[in-house]
Amino acid sequence: GVPCKLIQSMDGFRFWNLSEMRYFLRYLDKRVTTPVIPGELWEEAKRATSKTYARSQNMDLVKRCFEQFEHLNQTKYISDFKEFVFESSMEDFCDVSGSEVVVSTIHKAKGREFDDVYMLLTDNYIKNAELKRRYYVGITRAKNRLFIHTNGHCFDRLTADRHDRDDRSYTLPEEIVLQLSHRDVYLEFFKGIKREVLALQSGDRLQYRDFTLYTEKTDLPVAKLSVRMQKTLNDWFAKGYRVKSATVSFIVAWKPKDAPKEEPETAVLLADLTLTR
């Protein structure tokens, strides 16, 4: 019952490649005739994007992108806007106001500060300089109080107001959510189904069968899990979990890094898988 926000990130892709942003940029490119975006065209493009992606759960992020650019630029140059979007990440537009709890990785919390910080750290990482820098970033997010929960001994020698040891064993959660990235889907599978993928929007429900995701209404295959993700799922299946549901998280533009410049981009579907036991 506690108001909570998750600071999401886009592992493996830029905010620039989000389908909602690509639609807005294409709308402008087809109609703008001067370096400055006319106010009427800017508002028209926003309305068209909001209408086309009315059911998308990513539109709040997109609208905050518009608002931030408007706040920073009274005169809207198309080149400035493209640079602004290209250099932005999803974390830049996550609104955590009004949330009593903010859930985030250390990397995504960089640049933010909180009254109280709870760090959950496992001991299965190599203790190198990079890890120490990451821990430092997490520790320095706290303005008042810092709580570190760990199964390792990295912090044993540090002075603290309180040390507690918990020897209890905890069962696995009844439900988990796996957020798929580019590494978790078979990218070549998306070639040839761009129209079908672009017909979907963030939040749309999908069907899962045999490591493949299908549209709920037409039962068309729109994503196939990678070998890496299939192994991950099998590990969870062995622990008694099953896939309860799947939903579209992002639709993004993608093409291989070594692809010729003239090769068209592919629309890639990234989903959230909810597992229960």
What is each residue range found by the language model?
Residues 1-147, 152, 156-169:
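Core RecA-like ATPase module of SF1/SF2 helicases and allied nucleic-acid translocases
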Residues 156-277:
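Conserved active-site motif detector
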